[in-house]
Swiss-Prot record:
InterPro entries: Ankyrin_rpt, Ankyrin_rpt-contain_sf, Multifunctional_regulatory. The keyword Repeat applies. It comes from Acanthamoeba polyphaga mimivirus (APMV). The lineage of its organism: Viruses, Varidnaviria, Bamfordvirae, Nucleocytoviricota, Megaviricetes. Keywords: ANK repeat, Repeat. Transmembrane segments: none annotated. ANK repeats lie at residues 24-56, 65-98, 102-135, 139-172, 176-209, 213-246, 250-283, 287-316, 320-353, 357-386, 390-419. This is Putative ankyrin repeat protein L93. The keyword Repeat applies.
Length: 421
């Protein structure tokens, strides 16, 4: 039952039970629908109202939110009104393809809320009344997308099946370039589920389709594996032959994403899965960064150990000459950073190589003032008087960036105080 004040055309009322915001422009018919179950003869009142041809003429009027009486009735036919009311509205000429302000149709609302409504009957009924199945809202979402992304919450997998059986376009994309399958993969651990992912795959979804950023479903699942998606989804995609080496528009691969988001549960297992399925461990993104570089930047020591054990190139350089060791020194004020630097050095990282400007790992450590990193590098025989292309030494970096403790340490280690750039 809806708890609302008496009808007044100037008042605002809720369109849906879960809607905290109220809306103006309600017709008397809309009001009668949200209060149908407030009265023993609520349906009869609506039937009587629509027996008047004058009232039927306004059956498709939209309120200030763009909702029609049919939209409200379809969404609330289990709570505020009855299914008989939905049937009545359709029989009296309620239009099924009008859009709300956000361009949602009544079919989208029914598909989104089929679990709350109680069955897929309303969705089927709307389709029988020629509701357009592939029409998109302002975000490019279709009824199938709404059902797929919410199949474990407000919608159901039965709704997804129904829409597919009625020839919903499984490959249609939204404004982000994502289709129903990609969305199901992204939310397979929350509002959607693995059964929906399997269903969409079995019905012909292209497993390696790209969104506007060049991301595949596998990339999406890797990014969200410990939030809205899960490792089961990744395993399924890999078992179904998802390409592990597709690159997005900036050159990222699924492995790089797994390493970037590696400080989460299951991350090491995900990286292992990708490597076992042929992920290229040494390929670089658009900037030349490898998976190892991402792991070093984001300081996941277990990921770094795994990559090194799988023969990641420890001395690979990006397009400006950065190595994994330089990145570890640059981001040395993070957890595990000293342990990571030690690991890289123990595994053969070149301590004195320079980037495109001639900067060494020690220079990065001096610039970013991580005293423990500097001590470790010096203990491992880093060249204390190395010069970059401008003739700068680590001591000069420390002086320019006013790192007093670093300056003292370098002088104690006999840095050349008289060197000239």
């Amino acid at each position: 039952m809806a708890s609302v004040e008496p009808y007044n055309s100037a008042n605002e009322y809720p369109c849906y039970q879960e809607d905290k915001n109220k809306c103006g422009g309600f017709t008397r018919l809309m009001y009668m629908i949200i209060t149908e179950k407030n009265h023993k003869n609520g349906y009869k009142m609506i039937y009587s109202h629509l027996s008047n041809k004058k009232n039927v003429k306004t059956i498709n009027r939209q309120n200030n939110c763009g909702c029609t009486a049919l939209m409200i009735a379809v969404t609330e036919c289990k709570h505020w009104c009855s299914r008989k009311t939905v049937n009545l509205l359709l029989s009296k000429g309620a239009k099924v393809n009008l859009m709300k302000n956000e361009k949602q149709t009544v079919l989208m609302l029914a598909s989104l809320n089929s679990r709350q409504i109680g069955s897929t009957d309303i969705v089927k009924l709307l389709l029988d009344y020629d509701a357009k199945i592939d029409i998109s809202d302002e975000d490019g979402w279709t009824a199938l997308m709404y059902a797929s992304i919410n199949s474990n919450e407000s919608s159901t997998i039965a709704t997804v099946k129904l829409l597919l059986n009625r020839d919903a376009d499984i490959n249609k994309k939204d404004n982000q370039g994502k289709n129903s399958f990609m969305w199901a993969c992204q939310y397979s651990n929350t509002t959607s589920n693995i059964k929906t992912v399997k269903l969409l795959l079995n019905r012909g979804s292209n497993i390696d389709e790209l969104d506007n950023n060049g991301w595949t479903a596998l990339m999406i699942a890797c990014k969200y594996a410990n939030t809205t998606s899960n490792i089961k989804t990744i395993k399924l995609l890999l078992d179904r032959g998802a390409d592990t080496n597709i690159k997005d528009k900036i050159g990222l691969t699924a492995l790089m994403l797994a390493c970037k988001y590696a400080n989460t549960p299951n991350s090491i297992e995900i990286i292992k899965l990708l490597l076992d399925k042929g992920a290229d461990i040494n390929t670089g993104n658009g900037e030349g960064w490898t998976a190892l570089m991402f792991a070093c930047k984001y300081a996941n020591i277990e990921a770094i150990k795994l990559l090194l054990d799988k023969n990641a190139d420890i001395n690979a350089k990006d397009k400006i000459g950065l190595t994994a060791l330089m990145l570890a020194c640059k981001y040395a004020n993070t957890p595990n950073s000293i342990e990571i630097i030690k690991l890289l050095l123990d595994k053969g990282a070149d301590i004195n190589t320079g980037n495109g400007e001639g900067w060494t790992a020690l220079m990065f450590a001096c610039k970013y003032a991580n005293i423990e990193a500097i001590k470790l590098l010096l203990d491992k025989n880093a060249d204390i008087n190395a010069k970059d292309k401008d003739g700068w030494t680590p001591l000069m970096f420390a002086c320019v960036y006013a790192n007093i403790e670093t300056i003292k340490l370098l002088l104690d280690k006999r840095a050349d105080i008289n060197e000239i750039s």
